[in-house]
UniProtKB/Swiss-Prot annotation:
Keyword annotations of the record: Acetylation, Activator, Apoptosis, Biological rhythms, Cell cycle, Coiled coil, Cytoplasm, Cytoskeleton, DNA damage, Isopeptide bond, Metalloenzyme inhibitor, Methylation, mRNA processing, mRNA splicing, Nucleus, Phosphoprotein, Repressor, Transcription, Transcription regulation, Tumor suppressor, Ubl conjugation, Wnt signaling pathway
Coiled-coil ranges from the UniProt annotation: 829-909
Residues that span the membrane, as ranges: none
PTM notes: ATM/ATR-mediated phosphorylation at Thr-454 upon DNA damage promotes binding to SIRT1. Phosphorylation at Thr-454 promotes its sumoylation by switching the binding partner of CCAR2 from SENP1 to PIAS3.
Cleavable signal peptide: none
Lineage: Eukaryota, Metazoa, Chordata, Craniata, Vertebrata
Organism encoding this protein: Homo sapiens (Human)
Known outcome of mutating residue 591 to R: Loss of sumoylation
Protein name: Cell cycle and apoptosis regulator protein 2
PTM annotation (Phosphoserine): residues: 124, 569, 627, 675, 678, 681, 687, 808
Length: 923
């Protein structure tokens, strides 16, 4: 066992160099290697699954294979003990479920590996371990079935192989590996036959005349994936173990104690965080020596006991998010490019400290900020304003609200142990946004001050991601100008127009160079982020994502409460029994066909006949048709079960056995629930085309429900599963039962699918207007209150709602609500004005182009008129010449006619004289 441990530790320096097998003695492998020594690795994988690692499911190619382990895509390490089914060969395509742990020497380790059956005939040659891999195949009734595709003595090697060891006859290892992972379920023996039969049919089709290089294009449907956490998001505090359980790939510092989730009290369910206000933050791209944006301002009396940091949010606003969602819904008939997901549009402004993205903020200074930060909440706010001004150049003193988002607590070691507290605030950055007039004046001032860059400088500068909004707006403006050729003609001919492009219409706050704008998707979802991200930024991004999940999930919950329940007619007992008998007969027929087809393939090597059941591209057998319309009379429950069985076929899914226990055992990923194979998504999408509408056409939902659906739908598939909708409701923290969640989800679900893209939406708000409070907060009123608070999801009630001001009582809450409504209306009108300005600019461009065209046509018409006048004058001259010539001809005719008659008479006289002078003939 110690020899195996040395082999695991030593040959992996840097996580890339996978060396060969360890040296064995002349007496054979040691006794410890006769049984697979993978208990330690399996226990680690189990801890990772229960602890908090981030997992991915993807398709890769085996690039290296050794005695006890292999490598996929030169970066994912897997042991042979995690292989499900037949052992893969070198160069084969496999389906991998890998877990990421940056603390290990190899960060990506496979948890499960499965060889894909539908692979082309030409593959990379098998390694020298082919005889060992053959032992790991499933045993049939008559023994092991040899794989005819992989024969190393017929196919020459394409890759240089290492010399084969003389002592590699450890049959006990692979046999024990086979016994420890038997085929589960009733399809254990049938799956291998189905896959082999499918491969043989593919080979015959290709041998029948299809070229080797011809390959059917893969479907472009994205895999089904949702943004969902497997735990309730109402825990007020997270310690070291809780963070490891929630976020598996997170490296927690050794001095970390706990983090208090203050956003739960700052944004209760009754007053959630609003993305209504646009707050755009751009990083200046000026080439100047920028200070370290993560460096804290140096003060003489800085005290590390308290630190204040800010989470600067950059969001396009709710109207822009609605517009993207409506584009996705409107493009059902003609799908275009998929719009950008809301998680990619929500960004955070971060600083840089030693090539690492950190939060903006610094330590508390008693002389500059105040004396007691624990008693006076404005002290740490002053610290945040001072540090943000020094690091980013943004003045946050104009912000009206400062919400406490989280509090980190660290333990400073030493003889006098000290507690360090880091308070993270979320200020309302949208209140310091410049107005349209100020923004246009600022852009014009910068355009006037900046000299036009030369072509060489433009060629040397590389595009950066520091000001994406301005670049996108400039690109949109140039795209609109390029759509009409008349506008281009006007720009070329008109020399009075300014050369500088017009400023973008969306105001933004400008930050100093050196900062970075990272999207929420880039922090949480990226497998390989471009920036090194600090621990606090990672935790805050996860917490912000959980807050959005709770808020959007609560909107879905209120929407489900406002919808009427479905009336499902109970199935008749006679039809139900007939449907069950028909389903049993169909299952038996499928099993018989699967057993008979390999025998038919062995006897008939020719092409498949028309009577054989055709196989689909994904390897599924078609369902035999039922007679007499009994398929239409099946109950809805059995139809949904058949759909689930087809979607969860064991040949397609790698995690079929873990699907039901995924939520109960807390094995889900920390930020997503992923469907394992893309073929499942293709089948589901094809089945969605024939589905009826979920709701009555009269049921119209508000746009915030559409945005909530889009938030959970990570890949814009257009639908959500029943299971995921139930989990969304169960993670809200309102203590719903599983039966309650199931009944609510049944209002919008048809055949286990909620096709939200086909629903109707409008700009209406206030779904919870007629709902009682005890219904809005679930079962919280039935449970004992935890501590002092009666309802964690409810906002704290204030007894002093009236404030005396200038001799009159003012209801502050009502004023704030009215101001919020007016602000919402103002933002809506501003968005409409912005849209009208764009249309007006487009109309102006078209009008200018039309004017240029009119001028050109007028000049051409004037020229044609001149040419027409010249042609008319020429015609009149020709007419006069014609008349003159006609008169001359008539005069000549009149004079020549008598002369002709006179000549005729002279000729006649001459003839008569000649006849008279002829002598008489002699007798």
């Amino acid at each position: 066992m110690s020899q195996f441990k040395r082999q695991r530790i030593n040959p992996l320096p840097g996580g890339r160099n996978f060396s060969g097998t360890a040296s064995t003695s002349l007496l054979g492998p040691p006794p410890g290697l006769l049984t697979p020594p993978v208990a330690t690795e399996l226990s680690q994988n189990a801890r990772h699954l229960q602890g908090g690692e981030k997992q991915r499911v993807f398709t890769g190619i085996v690039t290296s294979l050794h005695d006890y382990f292999g490598v996929v895509d030169e970066e994912v390490f897997f042991q042979l003990s995690v292989v499900k089914g037949r052992l893969p060969q070198l160069g084969e395509k496999v389906l991998v479920k890998a877990a990421y742990n940056p603390g290990q020497a190899v960060p990506w380790n496979a948890v499960k590996v499965q060889t894909l059956s539908n692979q082309p005939l030409l593959k990379s040659p098998a390694p020298p371990l082919l005889h060992v891999a053959a032992l790991g195949q499933k045993q049939g009734i008559l023994g092991a079935q040899p794989q005819l595709i992989f024969q190393p003595h017929r196919i020459p090697p394409l890759f240089p192989q290492k010399p084969l060891s003389l002592f590699q006859t450890s049959h006990t290892l692979h046999l024990s590996h086979l016994n420890r992972f038997p085929a589960r379920g009733p399809h254990g023996r049938l799956d291998q036959g189905r896959s082999d039969d499918y491969d043989s049919k593919k080979r015959k089709q290709r041998a029948g005349g299809e070229p080797w290089g011809a390959k059917k294009p893969r479907h472009d449907l994205p895999p089904y994936r949702v943004h969902l956490t497997p735990y309730t998001v109402d825990s007020p505090i997270c310690d070291f173990l809780e963070l490891q359980r929630r976020y598996r790939s997170l490296l927690v510092p050794s001095d970390f104690l706990s983090v208090h989730l203050s956003w739960l009290s700052a944004f209760p369910l009754s007053q959630p965080f609003s993305l209504h206000h646009p707050s755009r933050i751009q990083v200046s791209s000026e080439k100047e020596a920028a200070p370290d944006a993560g460096a804290e301002p140096i003060t003489a009396d800085s005290d590390p006991a308290y630190s204040s940091k800010v989470l600067l949010l950059s969001s396009p606003g709710l109207e822009e998010l609605y517009r993207c969602c409506m584009l996705f819904v409107d493009d059902m008939a003609e799908p275009r490019e998929t719009p950008e997901h809301p998680l990619k549009q929500i960004k955070f402004l971060l600083g840089r400290k030693e090539e690492e993205a950190v939060l903006v903020g610094g330590e508390w200074s008693p002389s500059l900020d105040g004396l007691d930060p624990q008693a006076d909440p404005q002290v740490l706010v002053r610290t945040a304003i001072r540090c943000a001004q020094a690091q980013t150049g943004i003045d946050l003193s104009g912000c009206t609200k400062w919400w406490r988002f989280a509090e980190f607590q660290y333990l400073q070691p030493g003889p006098p142990r000290r507690l360090q507290t880091v308070v993270v605030y979320l200020p309302d950055v949208w209140t310091i946004m410049p107005t349209l007039e100020e923004w246009e004046a600022l852009c014009q001032q910068k355009a006037a001050e900046a000299a036009p860059p030369t072509q060489e400088a433009q060629g040397e500068t590389e595009p950066t991601e520091q000001a994406p909004d301005a670049l996108e707006q400039a690109a949109d403006t140039s795209r609109r100008n390029a759509e009409t050729p008349e506008a281009t003609t006007q720009q070329e001919t008109d020399t009075d127009l300014p050369e500088a492009p017009p400023p973008p219409l969306e105001p933004a706050v400008i930050a100093r160079p050196g900062c970075v704008n990272l999207s929420l998707h880039g922090i949480v979802e990226d497998r390989r982020p471009k920036e090194r991200i600090s621990f606090e930024v990672m935790v805050l991004a996860e917490l912000f994502l959980e807050m959005l999940q709770r808020d959007f999930g609560y909107r879905v919950y209120k929407m489900l409460l406002s919808l009427p329940e479905k009336v499902v007619s109970p199935p008749e007992p006679e039809k139900e029994e007939a449907a069950k008998e028909e389903a049993t007969k169909e299952e038996e027929a499928i099993k018989e066909e699967v057993v008979k087809e390999p025998k038919d393939e062995a006897q008939n090597e020719g092409p498949a006949t028309e009577s054989e059941a055709p196989l689909k591209e994904d390897g599924l057998l078609p369902k035999p048709l039922s007679s007499g319309g009994e398929e239409e009379e099946k109950p809805r429950g059995e139809a949904s079960e058949d759909l689930c069985e087809m979607a969860l076929d064991p040949e397609l899914l790698l995690l079929r056995d873990d699907g039901e226990e995924e939520f109960a055992g807390a094995k889900l990923e920390d930020s997503e629930v992923r469907s394992v194979a893309s073929n499942q998504s293709e089948m589901e999408f094809s089945s969605l085309q024939d589905m009826p509408k979920e709701l009555d056409p009269s049921a119209v939902l508000p746009l915030d429900c559409l945005l909530a659906f889009v938030f959970f739908d990570a890949n814009w598939c257009g639908y959500l599963h029943r299971r995921d909708l139930e989990r969304i409701l169960l993670t809200l923290g309102i203590r719903l039962s599983a039966e309650q969640a199931k009944q609510l989800v049944s209002r919008v679900v048809t055949q286990n699918i909620c096709q939200y893209r086909s629903l109707q939406y409008s700009r209406q708000e206030g779904l919870d207007g007629g709902l009682p409070e005890e219904v809005l907060f679930g079962n919280l009123d039935l449970l004992p209150p935890p501590g002092k608070s009666t309802k964690p999801g409810a906002a704290p009630t204030e007894h002093k709602a009236l404030v005396s001001h200038n001799g009159s009582l003012i209801n502050v809450g009502s004023l704030l609500q009215r101001a919020e409504q007016q602000d919402s209306g103002r933002l809506y009108l501003e968005n409409k004005i912005h849209t009208l300005e764009l249309k007006l600019e487009e109309s102006h461009n078209r009008f200018s182009a039309t004017e240029v065209t009119n001028k050109t046509l007028a000049a051409e018409m004037q020229e044609l008129r001149v040419r027409l006048a010249e042609a008319e004058e020429t015609a009149r001259t020709a007419e006069r010449q014609k008349s003159q010539l006609q008169r001359l001809l008539q005069e000549l005719r009149r004079r020549l006619t008598p002369l002709q008659l006179e000549i005729q008479r002279v000729v006649e006289k001459a003839d008569s004289w000649v006849e008279k002078e002829e002598p008489a003939p002699s007798n």
